[in-house]
Amino acid sequence: KIAMVLWRGETNVEQGFRAYFDENSIPVDLTIYDTARDLSRVPAIIDQIRKDPPDLVYTWGTGITSSVVGKYDAVDPAQNITDLPVVYVMVSSPWKTGIAAPAGQSRPNVTGATHIAPLAAQINAIRAYRPMDKLGVVYNSREDNSVSNVADLTELGREMGFEVLAAPLGTDGEPSQDDIAPAVAELARKGADILYIGPDNFIGNYRDTLTDAGFANGLAAFSATELEVRDGHAMLGLVSRYELVGRLAASKVEQILIDGISPADIPVETLDRFSYLIRLSSARKLKLYPPLSLLDYAEVIE
């Protein structure tokens, strides 16, 4: 029996999760708790889970996971789930955000599957398509995962020879969709070569606003997550397929519930292969066609 605490209902991640158990003939009873993008609902969901405890809790995303399990060095048994195994998905930087314990340590009841390709590989993916010296990033300054991602990119820029042009939203209150287009225009004015969409729930919700502003300013968008290319208009991405992330998480659940392995002994992992996606309609719109060499291994979406 598994309780699933989700950010925006079921996604392809959960389809992959379910498929893994179906294909391996493992019966599972899933109870869905949908926060509908509202983290304030999590405490009530935790109360419900405690009233009828499942065998395991599945959490989706950094915000929900952090609320459910706390940070590794600041767990509050009154607020966080400590007595049930928890497997998380779609946490982009579990170590940076304190959800995963530092190298050499583990958490007694928590493990998970992360989905972001190494940043250097992402930059190489952009440069395989076109030259890039200035990376434009519009992000929600109120999301820990976005802030840590921009900090890591800035540091990497010093090593790999590019400048991060950051446009934080929400520095003086909640971010607004109306702030996105002016931020993109400002990045274009500063000479950004491409827009970067990292793991950011706010930008994910308004991805079309961002890419439309990009088109208006002659800027393509690169995405580190699948949704923005497959269901949006980002021109390219180096991504984990959501369905495969779900299967990876399911394999960890199987280790815990069927094989009796402690979550502490199951490493937090990412997929070992990523997909290079190109959205051709966006390339056409911007007249930025992919080099032929990319077509040998990229998945081209019309």
State the predicted function of each range:
Residues 1-302:
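Short hydrophobic alpha-helices and adjacent helix-cap/hinge residues
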